[in-house]
Each structure stands twice: as structure tokens, then as C-alpha cells.
Amino acid sequence: MSGRSTVAIIGGTGAEGGGIALRLAKAGHCVLIGSRDAAKAKAAASALAALAGVTIEGDGNRAVAAAGEIAILTVPYAAQRPTIEEIRDILAGKILVDATAPLVPPRVNRVQLPEGGSAVAAIQALLGEAVKVVSAFQNVSAEKLRHLDQPVDCDVLVCADDAPARQAVIDLIATIGMRGIDGGPICNSAAAEALTSLLIWVNRKYKVPGAGIRITGIDD
């Protein structure tokens, strides 16, 4: 997936989704912003496009999910399952990148994994083999993504049961100047999800805007 792709950002009106959208659009991909409210999605897409000098379009979640070759889910944990239920019939045959971290307010800097261990693995179980669910972007700062004049100095852990889907997402990540790290099967997503709360703690403790992770010992 190193060429130009059509990418639907489901729940793309938030900070994380907007940051990913900006990076992908600047890299030359066709980016679609989705929301439950199509008007809100169009307004967000217009604002992002003006900010970056690129073309980004917006529409309802179902419309952009249908148009996208790959979908990236960037909604809060509480909205993860309802959003997937809204579009699950459209996702068959596609790759779904799920950036969900199971943050439970108000104590978002404490690890609170769901009973099954991984929020993203639960979505793979829900959707079945027809959809290739890939966990990625949980540990990437939205603030860093949105500063297009600066590189995002961290790695992206990528987990999925389907190895070709994992590699496709790693290749997509490379197009925005970041390094995807093959993190193995979807159950390993629990580690990436837990790291999000730890990084929030680090941000607050050390007063940094967006701590990330870097895997050492691997050649670029």
C-alpha cells in the first residue's frame, strides 16, 4: 500500500483523526473525513484542507466507509462499538485500522483494559474474518501529527491476525514518514492500548506535549 490510496477516517473530526488525515493528505492520499453528522464532517474536512493546502472531503460515516479502500477508526472508546455497528455491513473485504485506546474518564492515566484484554481484538471478534482489523496509532500524539512542519518522532505499533494486512498498514504508515513496527497478532494490541494511559501519565509528570515510543535495535 505504498501508492496512492483512498482512506476513510471514521470519526475524523476529532484531534487524532484530523492529525492522521492531514499527514495522509500531505503524502498524496485521497482522504475522506467521516462523522455521524455529515455537515460536521464536511466542515472539518474544509478546515483541515485549508490548513494544509490539500484536498480533503467529508461526509457521513457510512458514505466515506463505502468509498474508502481502507478505513481508520479514530473515535473515543465509548463510541467504538456503536460506530462499528453503524458501518459493519460496509466493511466486508476491507482493512479497518482501529486506533482505539480503552481510556475510561476521569482516570485516563491509569491502565483500564476491558475484560477481554484488548478493545481492538474485541472488534475483530465482532466483525469476523470478512474484515481485516489492524491495531495502530494508539501511542501517537494528535498534537505531533497536526504540526506538519515537524516530523513525528515515534514508532507505530501495528498488530493484526492477518499478516498481509499488517504489512499493508506498515507500508501506509511509511508514506507519512513514520515507522510501523510489526507487533504480531491482534491480541498483542492490549500492550499498545495499555501504553496510551502510561504515556498520558508521562506527559503530565514531565510536562511534555506528546510523549511517544521508539523501538531500538531495529535498522530503519
Task: Place the predicted regions along the sequence by residue.
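NAD(P)+-binding Rossmann beta1-loop-alpha1 motif at the extreme N-terminus of oxidoreductases
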Residues: 1-47
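Hydrophobic Val/Ile/Leu positions in short beta-strands of Rossmann-like dinucleotide-binding domains
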Residues: 9-10, 73, 158
